[in-house]
């Protein structure tokens, strides 16, 4: 069983864009999620940092009651019977 938050994270990471910078390091972002960006000396480190940033972004957004974008039909803004609803 995949929990909605896990599916949301995987869907978001599927939208990630990575660029190799002039100094050889990498930047990554998820354009649909404002402010979700990361940097790393290698692509693997950048991917890991982006996942961590995304997880924090989701938790802070939910905690503050901010409306998160629906991704892949997953709406983390709705809770039904103690479970996150999917559309």
Predicted segments, located by residue:
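Short, charged, surface-exposed hinge/linker loops at domain edges
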Residues: 1-15, 48-87
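Exposed, low-complexity/repetitive linear segments and helix-based recognition motifs
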Residues: 7, 26, 44-46
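Structural detector for hydrophobic anchor residues on beta-strands
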Residues: 14, 26, 36-38
